[in-house]
């Protein structure tokens, strides 16, 4: 089989390569055109031997009009395109043009030449803009290798937990020293109880449950001193593991209890202590003694 397909058009022989057309190409139709062949010169497309061209010039004088070939051809497979902007690193003159500095390459292709050409660039990166999938672009830009699962899905490019150590917080490293003036005891806010009618009841005061030992020591101290100074109150509170306010309130309640018992008569009046004990109390017995003392000198006179 010949390597070229010959077609006669306007006195010239047109040759096509069999790669240009598929096997199911259709026949073309030629229409005659009046005039001389010199008015419409045509250059041969493919290389034709000189003898064949000479024989064609001496054929019948019938002339044909310029025609178009109705030829079905197979489009090239899709390829990658690279739209490169003007820069000093590369130049877009042709498919095999080399740049001054050599380096990485960029794959490209076109509808005419679907081959694997490359531009020589300064660098090691591959640029794919058109006709490339998103996953392939991520793989080209990612520096770290990606793990591929059996299903074909790509794992996220985010680093796995624990890859980079978390910086320690300064609060955990430095120990904040607590001063004495910062140790201020503040009572928590007291919550009011809801009554059955929905009205908030007054807050209840939490009572202190004293132990037997604490009550014994407090009663002993109250027997000797009904009023305490602040220094003595702090000393008793430290010895009994109480605070100053608890001791102060206990002594106030104890004095009120003592006065209540005296008013009710359940307890005799305690003799006052101190200088008040030297005051004389007038009784009927002392009055009779005084009268006898006053009468005795008169008898002597």
From Swiss-Prot:
Keywords: Developmental protein, DNA-binding, Homeobox, Nucleus, Transcription, Transcription regulation. Signal peptide: none annotated. Residues 200-259 bind DNA. Belongs to the Antp homeobox family. Labial subfamily. A motif (Antp-type hexapeptide) lies at residues 178-183. The gene is hoxd1. Residues 291-301 have a biased composition (Polar residues). SUPFAM superfamilies: Homeodomain-like (SSF46689). GO terms for molecular function: DNA-binding transcription factor activity, RNA polymerase II-specific; sequence-specific DNA binding. Pfam families: Homeodomain (PF00046). Sequence-specific transcription factor which is part of a developmental regulatory system that provides cells with specific positional identities on the anterior-posterior axis. Acts on the anterior body structures. Acts downstream of meis3 to pattern the hindbrain. It comes from Xenopus tropicalis (Western clawed frog). It comes from the Eukaryota. This is Homeobox protein Hox-D1.
């Amino acid at each position: 089989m010949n390597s070229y397909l010959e077609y006669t058009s306007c006195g010239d022989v047109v040759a096509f390569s069999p790669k240009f057309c598929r096997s199911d190409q259709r026949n073309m139709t030629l229409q005659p055109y009046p005039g001389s062949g010199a008015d419409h010169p045509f250059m041969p497309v493919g290389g034709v031997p000189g003898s064949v061209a000479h024989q064609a010039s001496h054929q019948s004088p019938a002339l044909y009009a310029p025609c178009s070939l109705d030829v079905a051809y197979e489009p090239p497979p899709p390829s990658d395109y690279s739209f490169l902007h003007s820069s000093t690193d590369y130049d877009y003159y042709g498919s095999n043009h080399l740049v001054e500095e050599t380096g990485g390459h960029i794959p490209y292709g076109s509808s005419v030449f679907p081959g694997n050409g490359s531009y020589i660039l300064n660098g090691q990166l591959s640029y794919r803009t058109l006709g490339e999938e998103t996953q392939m672009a991520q793989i080209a830009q990612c520096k770290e290798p990606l793990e591929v699962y059996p299903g074909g899905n790509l794992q996220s490019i985010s680093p796995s937990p624990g890859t980079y150590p978390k910086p320690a917080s300064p609060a955990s490293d430095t120990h904040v020293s607590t001063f004495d003036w910062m140790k201020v005891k503040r009572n928590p806010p007291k919550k009011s109880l809801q009554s059955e009618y929905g009205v908030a009841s007054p807050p209840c005061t939490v009572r202190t449950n004293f132990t037997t030992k604490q009550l014994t020591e407090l009663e002993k101290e109250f027997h000797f001193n009904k009023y305490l100074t602040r220094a003595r109150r702090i000393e008793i509170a430290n010895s009994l593991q109480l605070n100053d306010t608890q001791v102060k309130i206990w002594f106030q309640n104890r004095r009120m209890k003592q006065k209540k018992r005296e008013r009710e008569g359940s307890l005799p009046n305690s003799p006052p202590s101190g200088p008040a004990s030297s005051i004389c109390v007038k009784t009927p017995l002392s009055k009779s003694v005084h009268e006898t003392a006053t009468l005795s000198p008169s008898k002597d006179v």
